[in-house]
Amino acid sequence: MTTFNPDIQYVMQQDKDDCYFGRYPTLARLNKEYCNTASVQWLNIQIYNLNEYCGCKDKMTQQQILDCARTISGMYYFLKVSELMLFFFRFKAGFYGKFFGSVDPMVITTALSQFCKERGEANAKHDNDIRMKQINEFRKNAISYEEWKKTRNKKSNNTNTTQ
């Protein structure tokens, strides 16, 4: 878990395909492998970092950070830590709006909902790319019906002449 600390968000975001499709643990996996609060503990660190990053005068309290971490862990247990690191980096970069006056957990969870839509689009594109690659591979060896009939007739004629 310490491998995925906020300091590597910048490195992780450089390869968004790896964030989306790489072999990284999900929040649910963290809970299963370590303890059932591992994802909340990990998210606490990420959210605290975001809280400190923002230039807002009014920061979230420890309780708000904890509640936000629990909400994300409960609702988005299927997200990989790499995806969440991409999200937090993008949030800091202003992809999902900004805070007005105070750091608001609702802004974070609303932004995460938007991120999940983007994730869905990336997954659909990825699946489509894989499908197209398979189709193109199939086409390399494919023949038309007419070519198949000619091949079949040749085989049939060869069989008849050898008998």
Ranges and model annotations:
Residues 1-163:
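Charged interaction scaffolds used for protein-protein
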